[in-house]
UniProtKB/Swiss-Prot annotation:
Belongs to the class I-like SAM-binding methyltransferase superfamily. Protein arginine N-methyltransferase family. One of its GO terms (cellular component) is nucleus. This is Protein arginine N-methyltransferase skb1. It comes from Schizosaccharomyces pombe (strain 972 / ATCC 24843) (Fission yeast). Coiled coil: none annotated. It is an enzyme of class 2 (transferase). Pfam families: PRMT5, PRMT5_C, PRMT5_TIM.
């Protein structure tokens, strides 16, 4: 787990705020109004307006712990009532309570969710009105993780309607309730994981006494709770009489924190890059910009990647004649980590090597000069310049590079290696890596889509982003077809065609995915697999990364958004088209998607389509020079 421990709170009255905090809870949920308000509202004539709160109707007053208080909207409100008067009165009260919560300085207010799908749009409009009536207040819609009906996704569908009607408002969040007897399918658990869960709410009755009388969660609830802890939500307990039945109030706090501490460690990439979760970054353009020292430093922290490279070079050396001298060139050497790998591999393989390092970044080249003097005893031949214009009077046996982007080719590795392969020995020369494949899968991520929208840039949805994805869910069925390959590149390129304007590196792919449960398409995630040498590989593709290169963190996936979220019904199909295009001076990617409902007779009905994104590279392209 990451270092953030869960924040635990409990529902209480205004008079017991201090006691609850003293018992170990870090925040409290407090009703904003009392029964008196309900009685007055019920007594109002249809033509009367609700005036300001009366003294006996206010259940909370600002005090020193206001920063530890979450407001609870009145439980009796019926924003989705079929009775227009009741719905209107409920909205009046909500607006009053929201205004009062803002006045008190509260950061958030919890609303009970809609009671059924029938009038959810009425509920959504009222919430939208409340959101727009305040400046900073967060609105947390409390919804059970499952509906309890035949359609497990009913509650999630209601939330999606509310969220969409409110325009993905940044202050609209979920307070997800985990009922005592809930048993949602894993698809639903994962779907909620992608949503903006600000808080987990649980009844104290969800706990059962262990043999020592202390409150614990059952196995299923414990597993769900453990998963959602990765989102760092606050935990709110309610049912104030339950502590008398199972232990004391502090026992809940102790147990919940014990659950956190007993979780298995988070993947290394999450531990090292926690601050990068769901943070959109534009991919590097190493051909047109010189990387900074900190960028090299971050790349060099990945022991897995360099261990794989070293093993690949070692294996390649072992396959060569023991008495020969092998000429190895590291192109794009940066600060020299691959040079270190090659020199170590030469020692462990007992092979003699002639080592060359080429780098075009003058700042990094100065580091290579220093390292050659201090670390390599002058054994490395250093070359300054662009690898594509390098013309040595000798041939290279092993050409080593680390030019891969998050989808393999997206940082122009093909263009670079095509441009330098003329230095390879035509008979025995090899490249490390020797090939790489790009993969893609459809994802649902309100968080990532909102991050792109919040850039307030008209081109934001037509760019690719590098991102450590956390708040997302896969839309494709969990089978062998969840991740589809788009295209591959092989080096050296054996095609004897004369390369003109880089046209041989154009690509097009069209792939389909099956959606087994309802969701919202917010874009596509891109990955790669690379073969370094023979069976030695690198992968950031989720289906193979654990087997090929576990705990590698040099690359985050690519996120390709779509301009407008697309609803994807259960058992529908998503079709994805992608182009890799070039004009000889730059390379860019274009993409679009279609959704289909496939009927039993094999025919299909188109549900929706997107436009082609980044047409002609208008929003983003990679410069070749």
């Amino acid at each position: 787990m990451n270092s953030k421990t869960p924040t635990l709170g409990i529902v209480c009255s205004e008079g017991t705020i201090s006691l609850s905090l003293e018992e170990g809870f870090e925040f409290v949920g407090v009703p904003l109004s009392g029964e008196g308000l309900k009685l007055r509202v019920e007594a109002l004539a249809p033509s009367e307006r609700l005036q300001e709160f009366l003294d006996d109707e206010v259940a909370y007053h600002p005090e020193e712990n206001v920063h530890k208080v979450v407001g609870l909207s009145s439980a009796w409100l019926e924003l989705d009532s079929e009775d227009t008067l009741i719905a209107d009165r409920s909205e009046e009260v909500l607006l009053k309570e929201a205004s009062y919560a803002s006045y008190c300085g509260l950061s958030s207010i919890i609303l009970n969710g809609p009671t059924s799908p029938m009038n959810v749009m009425r509920y959504a409009r009222a919430v939208s009105s409340a959101l727009n009536s305040t400046m900073n207040l967060k609105f947390l819609v409390q919804l059970a993780i499952e509906s309890g009906h035949e359609d497990y996704f009913e509650t999630w569908k209601m939330w999606d309607t509310i969220r969409s009607a409110c325009g993905y408002h940044p202050r609209l969040k979920v307070a997800l309730e985990l009922p005592p007897a809930c048993s949602p399918p894993i698809e639903l658990v994962n779907r909620w994981y992608a949503e903006p869960i600000e808080m987990i709410t649980m009844s104290c009755m969800a706990f059962v006494p262990n043999p020592n009388g202390y409150p614990v969660l059952g196995r299923k609830l414990r597993a769900i709770y453990a998963l959602y802890l990765r989102l760092n939500p606050r935990i709110l307990l309610w049912d104030n009489d339950a502590p008398e039945k199972i232990g004391d109030s502090p026992d809940y706090s102790i147990y919940m924190k014990h659950l956190f501490d007993s979780q298995p460690p988070a993947p290394l990439v999450e531990d090292l890059a926690d601050s990068y979760k769901d943070y959109l970054q534009v991919p590097l353009q190493p051909l047109s910009y010189n990387l900074e020292n900190i960028t090299y430093e971050i790349f060099e922290r990945d022991p897995v990647k360099y261990a794989q490279y070293e093993q690949a070079i070692f294996s390649a050396l072992m396959d060569r004649d023991e008495s020969s001298v092998t000429r190895i060139a590291v192109v794009g050497a940066g600060r020299g980590p691959l040079v270190d790998c090659a020199l170590r591999a030469a020692i462990s393989s007992s092979r003699t090597v002639d080592m060359i390092a080429l780098e075009k970044n003058p700042n990094a080249f100065s580091m290579l000069l220093m390292r050659n003097r201090q670390d390599w005893a002058g054994k490395v031949t250093l070359v300054f310049g662009d690898m594509r214009t390098w013309n040595p009077d000798y041939k290279i046996d092993i050409l080593v590079s680390e030019l891969l982007g998050s989808m393999g080719d997206n940082e122009l590795s093909p263009e670079c290696l095509d441009g330098v392969q003329h230095v390879l020995d035509e008979e025995t020369g090899i490249c490390i890596p020797s090939s790489y494949i790009s993969y893609v899968t459809p994802i649902m991520s309100p968080k990532l889509w909102s991050e792109a929208r919040n850039m307030n840039d008209p081109n934001a949805f037509e760019r690719q982003y590098v991102v450590l994805m956390n708040s997302f869910d896969f839309l494709a069925a969990d089978d062998e077809f969840r991740f589809q390959s788009l295209w591959s590149f092989h080096h050296p390129n054996k095609d004897s065609e004369v390369y003109t304007k880089n046209l041989h590196n154009k690509r097009f792919a069209s792939v389909r995915f099956q959606a087994s449960s309802p969701g919202i398409l917010h874009g596509f995630a891109g990955y790669f697999e690379a073969t370094l040498y023979k069976d030695i590989s690198l992968s950031i593709m989720p289906a193979t990364m654990e087997a090929k290169s576990p705990d590698m963190f040099s690359w985050f996936p690519i996120y390709m958004p779509i301009k407008k979220p697309m609803y994807v019904p259960e058992n529908s199909q998503l079709e994805f088209h992608m182009w890799r295009l070039t004009d000889g001076m730059r390379v860019w990617f274009e993409w679009c998607a279609n959704a289909y409902l496939v009927l039993r007779n094999g025919s299909q009905i188109k549900l929706s389509s997107t436009e082609v994104h980044n047409i002609s590279g208008k929003a983003f392209s990679c410069n070749m020079y």
